[in-house]
Swiss-Prot record:
Disulfide bonds: none annotated. This is 2-(3-amino-3-carboxypropyl)histidine synthase subunit 2. One of its GO terms (cellular component) is cytoplasm. [4Fe-4S] cluster binds at residues 107, 128, 362. Changing residue 362 to S: Resistance to diphtheria toxin. Abolishes [4Fe-4S] cluster binding and leads to abnormal reduction of the DPH1 [4Fe-4S] cluster. Its cofactor is [4Fe-4S] cluster. Pfam families: Diphthamide_syn. Changing residue 358 to A: Normal sensitivity to diphtheria toxin. Component of the 2-(3-amino-3-carboxypropyl)histidine synthase complex composed of DPH1, DPH2, KTI11/DPH3 and a NADH-dependent reductase, predominantly CBR1. Interacts with DPH1; the interaction is direct. Interacts with KTI11/DPH3.
Amino acid sequence: MEVAPALSTTQSDVAFQKVETHEIDRSSYLGPCYNSDELMQLISAYYNVEPLVGYLEQHPEYQNVTLQFPDDLIKDSSLIVRLLQSKFPHGKIKFWVLADTAYSACCVDEVAAEHVHAEVVVHFGDACLNAIQNLPVVYSFGTPFLDLALVVENFQRAFPDLSSKICLMANAPFSKHLSQLYNILKGDLHYTNIIYSQVNTSAVEEKFVTILDTFHVPEDVDQVGVFEKNSVLFGQHDKADNISPEDYHLFHLTTPQDPRLLYLSTVFQSVHIFDPALPGMVTGPFPSLMRRYKYMHVARTAGCIGILVNTLSLRNTRETINELVKLIKTREKKHYLFVVGKPNVAKLANFEDIDIWCILGCSQSGIIVDQFNEFYKPIITPYELNLALSEEVTWTGKWVVDFRDAIDEIEQNLGGQDTISASTTSDEPEFDVVRGRYTSTSRPLRALTHLELEAADDDDSKQLTTRHTASGAVIKGTVSTSASALQNRSWKGLGSDFDSTEVDNTGADIEEGISGVARGYGFDREDAMKKENK
């Protein structure tokens, strides 16, 4: 008999280890020689506490304020709360710290904020600035320490040719240093074809979005282009010149997340990364698009597709899901929808019936790029799934991750058709180019048009009308690929070894479970109210 699989997430020995020391190292962003006696002043300046206080004073209607920190800055949350509470005594404003984000740290966690009925979210650290659904947002990137002399030294070693076309880029916090780095390279070292990117604060047209940080642009620098929606390119080129990123080498401060890095590698000639936390320059290897092309062919012959939702805050998430479902059904494939926070190998391994995953997440860090083949099933994006399910597989060489662009591509692919064309409705198998053989299970929903099932005569029957096909089990007119896979397993979960001859006609007792969130379940609130009334 097979051993039951492990259904829990693996954890290391230090996952919940108690921290014994009270010393916290902040040299990576406050500098190696910061004075601990001036810690509160440095923290206040780094996190823009004074501008934040001014913002809250201008909006007295905000009484519940949530503070969202990434994992590497959560150690400063208590200090920030202490500084803010000193500015608003008598408990006029309640401050809540989001100690753990459900999805990507660069995105605003609206779901967690709504648990405490937040009226505004203050997001600290690096941010993707993607449009969200409802809540007002205040961004505070911070100004981390940077040794410019060390950066310039590594830059000169990587680019000895003064005429090379180079674009300077960084994440949101470190982008404040780019204008000064540009002046050194352009003015002192005489690099002639240098441009740099800056956060496009003017692109944030949302009424309830505020950026506390300020970005200095020298007077002799012109805007020469726009990179994506949230970055502006500056330089001393003629505005009439057409700035094409394909002509430039990228010099990036800090290491981008894998999805972001993959996108940048498809746009620029080459990518050079200098991370202040790591020694030396990194020039690869980077995630490759060649593996993505293979995954597209896997999706083309997949019978069961899992839609993996790794965000609940980004705008157009629901619209993208609806278009994906429509596309998958049109191609006569089965789909299942999963909402998973921080997906990992162990979580997704529990759903072995899924042939391929299509992930919806933030383009900066919410998309899984399986660079080392850790996951059991491939993971692709909506754009790649749309290319795979087209009538003919075409490879553009692009990597589109924006939801709005993906929706437009899917709508263009569907072309207003709700059903698959008659030429593809035959029972002929489809050739799987990855495994080099024909498969007849790539379109399980096609079987519905050939089945005529009759329900049981007894309306009180507890048995579902089931028929097994080559593609899956049909239960009351619905193809279930997971049910078919379950029937073929030797171990089917807890209770699978129950003696079927001992049938209890009364069935099991149904009990109502608990409701609410961990901060306060329903029965906790009821008990608290009873104690107050006594």
